[in-house]
Amino acid sequence: MDIQAISRYIRVSPRKMQLLAREVHSMAPEQAAGMLGHLNKNGALALKKLIESALTNAKVKELQAAQLKFKHIEVVSGGAMKRFRAVSRGMAHTYKKRMSHVRVVLTDDLVKKTTVDSKKEKSKI
């Protein structure tokens, strides 16, 4: 069973958020949330809150957090706010404050195996 949580328009550039996502992907979700709480990176707090939200969604569906693993963490560009900086001779240079959308999907291996086994039994009948 897949559990997901989505956070949109996070004010961290997708490149920086992707670095955190790669770091965390191989860990257990509870361990990842604990590590992100102590990390001094730009998007660590936002990613921690999102992982905790996904774990809470799993509790609502009565799944144990210890059995969950990351299926994938998807980070995509969420648009950009255009800003201007004053420069010499009355001109302005533009720059973008980029945002990102993050989607965390957790999966439970035990639930997955039982559903696959039940599908095989149904196909034999």
Which sequence ranges carry the predicted segments?
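Ribosome large-subunit tunnel/peptidyl-transferase-proximal elements
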Residues: 1-75, 99-115, 119-124
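C-terminal structural segments of small proteins and small subunits
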Residues: 90-98
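Short, low-complexity, polybasic intrinsically disordered segments
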Residues: 82-91
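Short, charged/polar surface micro-motifs in flexible loops or helix N-caps
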Residues: 76-81
